[in-house]
Amino acid sequence: SELCAVCHEDIAKAFAKSPHHLVDIGKKQGFEGRACEACHGPAEKHAESADAAEVRNPGKLTAAAADKICLSCHLNQPTHVGRLQSSHAKDQISCTACHKVHANGPDGLIARTPAALNAQCASCHINVWTQFQKPNHHKVPEGAMTCVDCHNPHGSIRPAMMQSFGSNEPGCLNCHGDKRGPFTFEHGPVRFEGCASCHEPHGSANPRMLARQEVRLVCLECHANLPTVNATGTIGVVPPAFHDLRSPRFQNCTVCHQKIHGSYVDRDLLK
């Protein structure tokens, strides 16, 4: 690496501030003895001729080939084991699309402030970012949360690269632990379909971030006995428990069914 720094002084100065520099100067992480050539390959011919063709440039490789270099060290890290099966990998989004290999501070190879990290995700996921502009949303634009609080950008066994906690529980329960259970009386969709079967995780017109503007519309996606149209064309004549949904008192399910995530005492989730 000292020989490389003779010509690549600017990169060497940036590299000195990078966690990868520990690979070169110490034995932390067990990566000792792997410096510039760990990523750029044998560089003896390049050092003699200064010919760029004589050294490997990961930035010019395919995403899969570049990732192979990174994963030669990082694949066994717990947060990276799903990388090869992740949607980022399948979409040819390489490690270096997010990480700056030579630069950045001692805590990582990516912007660490919430605003900068979220902006990096938003630069690709524009459609998701627009959902945060809805009136009810997780406080990501405000910087109180980051995308990686819920998602593992390196890959996950869960859909949408969701973070897993404990026994592969969805990341939602890391904050909303009161909804975890186990409950004596379970609400099936909560246990088997997940939070997103009812909620919009990024933003919603509903104060509780439901997938529909009104709670009854969410409930009726499962709890509707079809057909529910009578001879006069009225919808909702045969709803669950024979409630008449034409009556205003039956149009907000959670007035009575307050424990919709699960209950310890009531099979109908009333309390």
Model-derived features: positions:
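Short sequence/structural segments immediately N-terminal
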Residues: 1-271
